[in-house]
Design a protein with these regions (language model features):
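An N-terminally biased module of ancient metal coordination in phosphate/nucleic-acid-related enzymes
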Residues: 1-72
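Active-site gating/metal-coordination segments in enzymes
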Residues: 53-140
Length: 140
């Protein structure tokens, strides 16, 4: 069995599955994502999708908007996994900046209850975000 150990969700899931088949990959470990450059129909739309990533890395989002964004990303991830469980498994997102109790609850509700295999990925864009990883590690 050939497993791709790191892919981000591509929409629609059927498109991602087709890419796996063309590459003779049996299964992929998926990670949630916010930008979806594959949906862009023009260079301008592609730039808009990538701007989302740059705002995240710059820490320009509120704690509430980050939690909402990651929850939506986890839901997309779960839809892909549930549509093709023989081909996809996944790691879910956990927001930074929550308290230890909130982080533990998030992991229980969003990750464990949904059968996800782990958490990730993190791309901290500031020293503050790097320090906030400690809470996630403690909650595990």
């Amino acid at each position: 069995m050939i497993i791709d150990s790191h892919e981000h969700v591509i929409l629609p899931a059927e498109s991602q599955l087709e890419k796996l088949k063309r590459a003779s990959v049996d299964k992929a470990i998926l990670f949630y994502t916010t930008p979806h450059p594959e949906k862009a129909k023009s260079y301008g739309e592609w730039k808009e999708e990538m701007a989302k990533l740059f705002r995240i890395l710059a820490g320009e989002n509120t704690e509430k908007s980050n939690s909402e964004r990651i929850h939506r990303g986890n839901q997309e991830l779960l839809r892909s996994i549930r549509a093709f469980p023989e081909h996809f498994t996944g790691f879910g997102g956990v927001p930074l900046g929550l308290s230890l109790t909130e982080t533990g609850s998030w992991i229980e509700e969003e990750i464990l209850r949904n059968g996800l295999r782990g958490i990730g990925e993190y791309t901290p864009g500031s020293e503050e975000q790097i320090r906030q990883l400690e809470t996630v590690f403690q909650a595990l």
